[in-house]
Amino acid sequence: MTATPAVIGLSAGNRLLSASFGPTDLMPDKVSLGVGGGGGGGGGGGGGDAMSFAPPAPATPKLTAVAAHRLKLSPHGRAQVMRALRHHSSAAAALAPPPPPPPPPTPSPASRAAHAHDLESSLEAIVLLQRSMLEKQWELPFDDDNHAMAIGLAEDDDDTSKATVVVARSSVSARQRRMSGRRRGRTKNGAAHFAVSPELIQSRNRIYLRGTVSKELLTHKQVVHLSHKIKDGIWLQQQRSKLKEKLGNEPSYKQLAHSLKISPPELRSRMHESFLAREMLTMSNLRLVISIAQKYDNLGVELADLIQGGLIGLLRGIEKFDASRGFRISTYVYWWIRQGVSRALAENSKTFRLPTYLHERLIAIRGAKYELEDQGIAPTIENIAGSLNISEKKVLNATEAVNKVLSLDQQAFPSLNGLPGETLHSYIEDQNVANDPWHGFEEWYLKEEVNKLLNSTLNERERDIIRLYHGIGKQCHTWEDISRQFGLSRERVRQVGLIAMEKLKHAARRKNLEALLEDY
């Protein structure tokens, strides 16, 4: 507990300092931390003009210090009096018990208004601080129209401590502001970043939204601008390929930028703008791809595959488009889209893939056939060849290449009872003789007859020589190999073999098996 001195009047303070105190007057039971009314307990003088110490709590004992005489003291004596007074005041404060906490004051209407004003000021300061921090972070001018914040304080009559803060949402997302701030930032060397053109990004956002095709068409001026961006990107890719051949590996952005004598940020910006320009032109002509692909629908290919082929042709046409010739891009890419759709139709419509030129020739032959039928002329090969101004051999080869493909697992006839019937595989002859069971039986029967003939006609040595030489059940051997196995000369083994063959011929004729030994 500390005592807070309060000086009430300058004259009273002077009188207190000019008074003298006796030892008995400064006892704790006579020191008061307040102002005594009138003279009070120690004698007259003083009255209400005296130096007082305001008591912090009513429970503190009242200790009074009263001047007995009015004497004139020197400055040194006054200092001693003040030190004695402070010493006894601190002792009295130490003996007093701690006071209870003061009750909360009842707010007045003036204090309520001041509190609301302070709260409003603090909220405004917080909002302004956040605003300045965001401006510093994004380094963008803070537009009051797009980034206005409205702060409203709703005061309730019953509860004045609640305040509602209403922040209006900006039309530009935080992510876009961060990206713009990064693009507008500066490099470590102090050079400015080369940011992507904001007009290009805004146009891209208007063209499509999450893959949805937009009905907004590009003007000729926009197409020319985007075409120049694409040409620039193609040129950069060509320079990158040349540098790759020169270095022997994939060059980095720094290496490519150094070879082109530009900065890496500028290189990245130009390549990104080329990518965005190609994407914008592709999305703006997507409806043309769909309309062309729908004309080739129901020809054996899914519409999605046709659209994919048309998109490949569209990308090729966008890269080849030259805006300086004055043609519209839709007129130019139409033929590229049509070529891509036709190629997709040729590659996916048949089970066995036909070359693209042959597929185009078949389309021309089909068209000539319909024209001849409309004119009442028989669509023969000669008439079709004359109509297309090609040879009859080319027409014949193209028509023979088109064969209907059927699966052997397909049912040969429709089932009447709902059960699976016989398939086409059951009605097709197998040309492989090894798969014929009768052929296997005949081969096994002939082997048995030959073995019986050998066992019944020849002795053991003759049978072994014949089996080794002709490879019956084993590998064929020469007369020299057989002679080494039997320890005989080559000529002797050959004579034994010839004699054995003559015996077999006579025995085969008797059993009507001479056809087996006809070659011998």
Curated annotation (Swiss-Prot):
It is found in: Plastid, Chloroplast. Residues 1-66 form a transit peptide. Keywords: Chloroplast, DNA-binding, Plastid, Sigma factor, Transcription, Transcription regulation, Transit peptide. The keyword Transcription regulation applies. SUPFAM superfamilies: Sigma2 domain of RNA polymerase sigma factors (SSF88946), Sigma3 and sigma4 domains of RNA polymerase sigma factors (SSF88659). Expressed in shoots. Expressed in the tips of fully elongated leaves. Expressed in leaf blades. Residues 37-49 have a biased composition (Gly residues). It comes from the Eukaryota. Residues 479-498 bind DNA. GO terms for cellular component: chloroplast. InterPro entries: RNA_pol_sigma-70_dom (IPR014284), RNA_pol_sigma70 (IPR000943), RNA_pol_sigma70_r2 (IPR007627), RNA_pol_sigma70_r3 (IPR007624), RNA_pol_sigma70_r4 (IPR007630), RNA_pol_sigma_r2 (IPR013325), RNA_pol_sigma_r3/r4-like (IPR013324), Sigma-70_RNA_pol_init_factors (IPR050239). Residues 96-108 have a biased composition (Pro residues). Induction: Induced by light in dark-grown seedllings. GO terms for molecular function: DNA binding; sigma factor activity. Residues 175-187 have a biased composition (Basic residues). GO terms for biological process: cellular response to light stimulus; cellular response to redox state; DNA-templated transcription initiation; photosystem stoichiometry adjustment; regulation of DNA-templated transcription; regulation of RNA biosynthetic process. Disruption phenotype: Pale-green leaf phenotype due to reduced chlorophyll content. Residues 37-57, 87-117, 171-190 are annotated as: Disordered. A motif (Polymerase core binding) lies at residues 305-318. The keyword Ribonucleoprotein does not apply. Belongs to the sigma-70 factor family. Sigma factors are initiation factors that promote the attachment of plastid-encoded RNA polymerase (PEP) to specific initiation sites and are then released. Controls the transcription of the psaA and psaB genes in chloroplast, and thus maintains the abundance of the core protein complex PsaA-PsaB of photosystem I (PSI) in the thylakoid membrane. Maintains PSI activity, sufficient rate of electron transfer from PSII to PSI, and photochemical efficiency. This is RNA polymerase sigma factor sigA.
